[in-house]
């Protein structure tokens, strides 16, 4: 039989790792964005691929948030994690529509949200 605290700690650790990966992805993407802004082709493709990877990482982080939210009863971090994939989908759509300035502003909002999710997950006490 599994100890509830151990299972809850595992879910929190899963959330922490997923949030860390999402934060790293969100930091890499603007570094590659200098390519599309300057008209460089290969960086433009890499920026798009990292953006799609960020969406997948945001989904994984949201799963971690759901698991932690159910185990701990704390829904705040769960809803923060659930906002990341939504922001990522909107971000991808804006990039595909070539709405550059809105894409850049929302990109920084996504970066802040991903880094904040990781730092908040680090601060959460173990259940």
Please annotate each region the language model reported:
Residues 1-127:
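Polytopic transmembrane helical bundles with strong interfacial aromatic enrichment
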């Amino acid at each position: 039989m599994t100890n509830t605290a151990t299972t809850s700690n595992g879910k929190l650790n899963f959330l922490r790792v997923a949030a860390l990966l999402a934060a790293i992805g969100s930091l890499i993407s603007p570094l590659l964005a200098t390519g599309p802004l300057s008209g460089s082709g290969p960086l433009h493709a890499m920026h798009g691929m990292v953006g799609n990877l960020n969406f997948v990482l945001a989904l994984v982080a949201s799963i971690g948030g759901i698991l932690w939210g159910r185990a701990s009863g704390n829904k705040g971090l769960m809803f923060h994690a659930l906002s990341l994939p939504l922001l990522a989908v909107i971000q991808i759509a804006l990039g595909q529509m070539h709405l550059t300035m809105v894409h850049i502003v929302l990109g920084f909002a996504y970066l802040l949200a991903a880094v904040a999710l990781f730092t908040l997950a680090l601060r959460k006490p173990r259940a």
